[in-house]
């Protein structure tokens, strides 16, 4: 059975807060890992791939 009056475990707070910073850090780590993987697979750096170098 579902509880209809169940509260969120993490309340939504707009702006800079601990939860937003945690998500920001997680997404930054995932993005960094993806950039490293792309550079390893293509043997080119990201600047060469987007033609900025």
From Swiss-Prot:
Source taxon at top rank: Eukaryota
Major site of localization recorded for this protein: plastid
Assigned protein family: Belongs to the ELIP/psbS family.
Function, as annotated: Possible role in chlorophyll and/or carotenoid binding.
Species lineage: Eukaryota, Cryptophyceae, Pyrenomonadales, Geminigeraceae, Guillardia
Protein name, entry field: Uncharacterized protein Ycf17
Naturally occurring in which organism (per UniProt): Guillardia theta (Cryptophyte)
GO MF term set: chlorophyll binding
GO cellular component: chloroplast
Keywords: Chlorophyll, Chloroplast, Chromophore, Plastid
Record localization: Plastid, Chloroplast
């Amino acid at each position: 059975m579902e509880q209809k009056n169940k509260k969120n475990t993490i309340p939504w707070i707009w702006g800079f807060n601990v939860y937003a910073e945690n998500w920001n850090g997680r997404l930054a780590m995932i993005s960094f890992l993806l950039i490293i993987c792309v550079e390893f697979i293509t043997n080119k750096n990201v600047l060469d791939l987007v033609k900025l170098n």
